[in-house]
């Protein structure tokens, strides 16, 4: 059986990457993939504290811009990235995967949900409410992961973030993804101590299922 990742670069960044640097790198790689000059890429990394604005961002939801605010070009509204949060960028060519953006988003969601389940965390997506959700320590529903994508020339950009152990107070500077009636949580808040390497390995272990789902197979 062939390795589903054999034609895809799997890159794990050892240190923090400035958000603008990552954005420029994604733009260049997107163009190269679309032109047939580069392999597809799944990129795992961490950013210094930053607020990013999606194409639907509402300035009223930027409550306290204590960190740099960067226009991301992805769909969605404001989100926060910072230390303790694992970010995954997927630059994949949908021209050979049915050109189905909705299926791509659902596959990303299911990939994150399946990986969280590895560590005993049940999570879910909700129609009309962007993100990955779980039950917080007080029993209330809270966001543990964010989803935001862009597709240009049928090549995807951006992807997801999952809260391993970020400073959750940093989310108070925005209304995360425009949803103010729910809180934000993390694996650490749920009592699970997890190194980024452990998360990355579990995610990679489910990458084949994620790619199969992009081909139209159920996860």
From Swiss-Prot:
<dbReference type="GO" id="GO:0005737">
    <property type="term" value="C:cytoplasm"/>
</dbReference>
<dbReference type="GO" id="GO:0033819">
    <property type="term" value="F:lipoyl(octanoyl) transferase activity"/>
</dbReference>
<keyword id="KW-0808">Transferase</keyword>
<feature type="domain" description="BPL/LPL catalytic">
    <location>
        <begin position="36"/>
        <end position="215"/>
    </location>
</feature>
<feature type="binding site">
    <location>
        <begin position="159"/>
        <end position="161"/>
    </location>
    <ligand>
        <name>substrate</name>
    </ligand>
</feature>
<feature type="binding site">
    <location>
        <begin position="146"/>
        <end position="148"/>
    </location>
    <ligand>
        <name>substrate</name>
    </ligand>
</feature>
<keyword id="KW-0963">Cytoplasm</keyword>
<comment type="similarity">
    <text>Belongs to the LipB family.</text>
</comment>
<dbReference type="InterPro" id="IPR020605">
    <property type="entry name" value="Octanoyltransferase_CS"/>
</dbReference>
<feature type="active site" description="Acyl-thioester intermediate">
    <location>
        <position position="177"/>
    </location>
</feature>
<dbReference type="InterPro" id="IPR045864">
    <property type="entry name" value="aa-tRNA-synth_II/BPL/LPL"/>
</dbReference>
<dbReference type="InterPro" id="IPR004143">
    <property type="entry name" value="BPL_LPL_catalytic"/>
</dbReference>
<comment type="pathway">
    <text>Protein modification; protein lipoylation via endogenous pathway; protein N(6)-(lipoyl)lysine from octanoyl-[acyl-carrier-protein]: step 1/2.</text>
</comment>
<dbReference type="InterPro" id="IPR000544">
    <property type="entry name" value="Octanoyltransferase"/>
</dbReference>
<feature type="site" description="Lowers pKa of active site Cys">
    <location>
        <position position="143"/>
    </location>
</feature>
<feature type="binding site">
    <location>
        <begin position="74"/>
        <end position="81"/>
    </location>
    <ligand>
        <name>substrate</name>
    </ligand>
</feature>
<dbReference type="GO" id="GO:0036211">
    <property type="term" value="P:protein modification process"/>
</dbReference>
<dbReference type="Pfam" id="PF21948">
    <property type="entry name" value="LplA-B_cat"/>
</dbReference>
<keyword id="KW-0012">Acyltransferase</keyword>
<protein>
    <recommendedName>
        <fullName>Octanoyltransferase</fullName>
        <ecNumber>2.3.1.181</ecNumber>
    </recommendedName>
</protein>
<comment type="function">
    <text>Catalyzes the transfer of endogenously produced octanoic acid from octanoyl-acyl-carrier-protein onto the lipoyl domains of lipoate-dependent enzymes. Lipoyl-ACP can also act as a substrate although octanoyl-ACP is likely to be the physiological substrate.</text>
</comment>
């Amino acid at each position: 059986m062939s390795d589903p990742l054999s034609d895809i670069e799997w890159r794990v960044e050892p240190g923090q990457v400035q958000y603008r640097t990552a954005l420029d790198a994604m733009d260049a790689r997107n163009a190269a993939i679309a032109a047939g000059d580069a392999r597809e890429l799944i990129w795992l990394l961490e950013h210094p504290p930053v607020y990013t604005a999606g194409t639907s961002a509402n300035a009223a939801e930027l409550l306290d811009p204590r960190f740099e605010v960067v226009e991301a070009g992805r769909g969605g509204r404001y989100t926060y990235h910072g230390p303790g949060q694992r970010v995954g960028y997927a630059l994949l060519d949908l021209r050979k995967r049915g050109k189905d953006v909705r299926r791509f988003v659902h596959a990303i969601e299911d990939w994150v949900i399946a990986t969280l389940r590895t560590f005993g965390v049940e999570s879910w997506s909700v129609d009309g409410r962007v993100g990955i959700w779980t039950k917080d320590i007080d029993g209330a529903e809270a966001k543990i992961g964010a989803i935001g994508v862009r597709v240009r020339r049928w090549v995807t950009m951006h992807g997801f973030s999952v809260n391993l152990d970020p400073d959750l107070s940093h989310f108070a500077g925005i209304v995360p993804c425009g949803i103010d009636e729910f809180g934000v949580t993390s694996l650490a808040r749920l009592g699970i101590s997890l190194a980024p390497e452990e998360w990355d390995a579990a995610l990679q272990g489910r990458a084949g299922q994620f790619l199969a789902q992009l081909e139209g197979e159920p996860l």
